Amino acid sequence: MPADAASPRLLGGAAAGSDALVLGIETSCDETAAACVRGGTDVLSSVVSSQVDLHAKYGGVVPEIASRAHNELIIPVVARAMVEAGVDGRRIDAVAATTGPGLIGALLVGVSAAKALALTWDVPFVSVNHLEAHLYAALLEDPHLELPMVVLLVSGGHTMLVLMEDHGRYRILGQTLDDAAGEAFDKVARFLGAPSPAEVPRGGKPGRGAA
């Protein structure tokens, strides 16, 4: 995870303790998401459009289908995030977007939209490393957490134990060598004939054949 390729720490330095307003865009896999965040931790809005129903019949995410769905959803999702935050482009100080890891086609949609908005509003575009953003999620939840700390990162194709020594300084203590936890879970579920997440009953009721 190259520290200079990600923005949480950069935005932390620029926005923490200030009123800097950042529009964040995420399209790394099968969710189109946008959020407006002030001062690094104050989430004014967070809009997520899931494609889980769209991919259910395939037993997993289909990259091409995901990319096309992002193309259709990116503008309304961003617009809704800004409306819910009560802001317009004149108040945005920077636009951030996930640039990887992730599905290439899906990432391109979010990055292209973010760069276009940044250019239109004449504000900086900030590249976000997907994995580094996950590390910083804990700090978003509790800004008072102190470094160094050990983080268990489980996201899609990545499962690793990371030591956050300082902002932008990380050491991978261990990681899966082949399939990540999520991938292994999906493969076993398909082998057992388990339903896709979209078909799993909600409310604590076990699905058919649940162990």
Regions found by a protein language model. Give the residues of each.
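N-terminal beta-alpha supersecondary unit
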Residues: 10, 17-91, 97-101, 108, ...
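A short helix-loop
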Residues: 2-20, 28, 35, 154, ...
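Short Gly/Thr/Asp-enriched flexible loops that form oxyanion-binding sites at enzyme active sites
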Residues: 97-121, 140
